[in-house]
């Protein structure tokens, strides 16, 4: 490892004053430190010369009594440091594991855990689990997804609403109602064997109020606001505002989301190190291809720099995406590595969620075309890409688990849905699709998160009427939508260099928005990408009104001897022809 020091947090009755010793000589105890609680001891080990082994660490109290515990140093997987994270050629499938598929009914309820399974309650646990994902990996792969991001599956031993996973009560333990650590590791391995990576959702900002740290806090400054609820202002702009006062910055960063989510103080170096080591441990143990960080900007700003740099030092080709829910590109861009920013902040975060583009797409398809409305919102948003260090590495999406589903946002209009999905699966960035979006799942009449995260049909043995995994019982529209997503995803797989490459777009005109994706000749990295298809282009035309469109207007990117083959029906056109496009069309062409 680049950093060979390991800090252990030891918890036990009155361990704070114990003396630490190890029999083996190749692991060195650098120091130990107690904080406020008499039940915690922090031990720093130097493992730079150590081999894989099981350590026996002895704790001797003032009376000479000895207790010991084992700590295992494991061998790293070969090539672990050079692992390649998810990237622009990928497509991410976002899953709420409790709502996707129930592969093991035996773990629906587990002794010692409250919040029992109740599928009839929208805010309750429904029984989905790791085995349900494993059982349906072929569906995910065959659709064309190459990465899976699940909402957090670490232990959430909360009294209610534990299904969503964002109230961690143990950072090193998969919630047994989802499965076990071994099952999660096996999921990652099996997915990898099918060409699918696993992105782990991590929460650095807060914990669940039933965490041990709230019953026995290691130090007085472990939790912000002295361990008492003070709500965050959510005024993220204060972190970037050159005119901001410190109290506004503190009000944003140190405030809690809700009383059941205590806000962590990452300025405490032991807590910071705990969170850093935990992330690295999961990358190593589970063979992750990426991390998604919840509420990215809310933790301490200096800590975020430390956290991202430490992880990227260990895995230079890895990818981490941060959730910064702002519709202002200047705010989201600030966090991405190599972006233009007004200060010397050192961000090593490779990717951010592109909320500005998501908002622009919905706005474009929900408004009439004019000089300042319609597709111009997408065009203007993409025109600000100069703010980002790497716009191709942004994660783009039509919706997610925290907002209304895109079909609902667009008024349950399948043509608008098609235009949105076509755009977001073909423009620059890494597309993420929320489970069920491919079959027009909606939340009509309610914006409740429990409704938005409804069960995927076919994931439960009792789902006899409809099964989206097999297609049984789907309506014609649902089946069409599923096949449309599949076709677009498979296009991405067959043309990776184009979707990792350049975006060139024309300013919208008369309700028509056109762009191409083409290979960046300077970035062709593999033999597979360096074949003849790198000369192909992908052209996308979105139009709201029926139009006769002469392809000659695109002479800058097309030549007369080229042929355009339409993805939807395989029909071919010469670049000199005129297209007759019906209203509300989303046309994708392979240009050869």
Regions found by a protein language model. Name each.
Residues 1-16, 75:
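Beta-strand/beta-sandwich contexts
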Residues 42-50:
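Short, hydrophobic beta-strand segments
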Residues 53-59, 63-91, 134, 138-141, ...:
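Carbohydrate-interacting/catalytic domains
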Residues 206, 211-214, 280, 284-289, ...:
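Active-site-proximal helices and loops of the catalytic beta/alpha 8
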């Amino acid at each position: 490892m680049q950093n060979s020091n390991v800090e252990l947090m030891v918890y036990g009755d009155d361990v704070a004053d114990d003396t630490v010793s190890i029999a083996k000589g190749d692991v060195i105890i650098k120091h130990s430190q107690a904080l406020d609680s008499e039940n915690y001891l922090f031990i720093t080990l130097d493992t730079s010369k150590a081999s894989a082994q099981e350590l026996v660490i002895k704790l001797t109290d003032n009376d000479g009594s000895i207790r010991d515990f084992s700590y295992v140093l494991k061998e790293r997987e070969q090539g672990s440091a050079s692992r390649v994270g998810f990237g622009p050629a990928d497509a991410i499938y976002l899953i709420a594991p409790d709502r996707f598929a129930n592969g093991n009914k035996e773990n629906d309820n587990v002794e010692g855990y409250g919040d029992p399974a109740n599928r009839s309650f929208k805010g309750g646990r429904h029984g989905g689990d790791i085995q349900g994902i494993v059982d349906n990996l072929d569906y995910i792969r065959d659709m064309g997804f190459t990465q899976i991001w699940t909402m957090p599956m670490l232990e959430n031993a909360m009294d209610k609403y534990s299904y969503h996973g964002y109230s961690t009560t143990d950072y090193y333990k998969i919630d047994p109602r989802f499965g076990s650590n071994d099952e999660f590791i096996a999921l990652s391995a099996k997915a990898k064997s099918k060409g699918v990576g696993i992105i782990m959702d991590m929460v650095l900002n807060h914990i669940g109020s039933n965490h041990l740290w709230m019953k026995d806090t290691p130090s007085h400054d472990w939790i912000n606001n002295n361990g008492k609820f003070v709500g965050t202002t959510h005024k993220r702009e204060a972190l970037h505002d050159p005119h901001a006062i410190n109290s506004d910055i503190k009000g944003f960063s140190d405030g809690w989301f809700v009383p059941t989510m205590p806000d962590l103080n990452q300025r405490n170096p032991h807590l910071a190190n705990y969170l850093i080591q935990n992330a690295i441990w999961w990358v190593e143990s589970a063979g992750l291809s990426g991390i998604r960080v919840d509420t990215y900007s809310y933790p301490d700003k200096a800590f975020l720099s430390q956290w991202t740099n430490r992880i990227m030092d260990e895995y230079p080709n890895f990818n981490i995406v941060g959730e910064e829910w702002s519709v202002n590109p200047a705010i989201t861009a600030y966090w991405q590595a190599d972006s233009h920013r007004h200060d010397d902040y050192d961000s090593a975060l490779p990717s951010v969620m592109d909320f500005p583009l998501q908002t622009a797409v919905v706005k474009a398809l929900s408004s009439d075309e004019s000089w300042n409305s319609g597709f111009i919102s997408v065009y203007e948003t993409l025109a600000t890409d100069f703010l980002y260090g790497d716009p191709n590495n942004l994660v783009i999406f039509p919706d997610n688990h925290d907002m209304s589903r895109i079909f609902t946002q667009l008024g349950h209009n399948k043509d608008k849905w098609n235009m949105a999905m076509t755009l977001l699966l073909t423009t620059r960035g890494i597309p993420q699709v929320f489970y069920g979006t491919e079959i027009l799942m909606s939340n009509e009449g309610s914006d409740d998160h429990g409704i938005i995260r409804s069960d995927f049909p076919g994931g439960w043995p009792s789902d006899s009427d409809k099964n989206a995994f097999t297609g049984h019982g789907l309506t014609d529209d649902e089946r069409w939508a599923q096949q449309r997503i599949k076709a677009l995803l498979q296009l991405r797989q067959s043309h990776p260099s184009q979707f990792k490459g350049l975006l060139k777009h024309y300013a919208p005109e008369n309700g028509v928005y056109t762009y191409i994706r083409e290979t960046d000749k300077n970035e062709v990295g593999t033999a597979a990408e360096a074949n003849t298809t790198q000369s192909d282009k992908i052209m996308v035309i979105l139009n709201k009104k029926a139009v006769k469109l002469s392809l000659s207007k695109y002479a800058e990117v097309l030549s007369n001897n080229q042929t355009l083959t339409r993805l939807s029906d395989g029909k071919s056109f010469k670049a000199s022809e005129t297209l007759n496009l019906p209203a509300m069309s989303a046309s994708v062409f392979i240009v050869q």
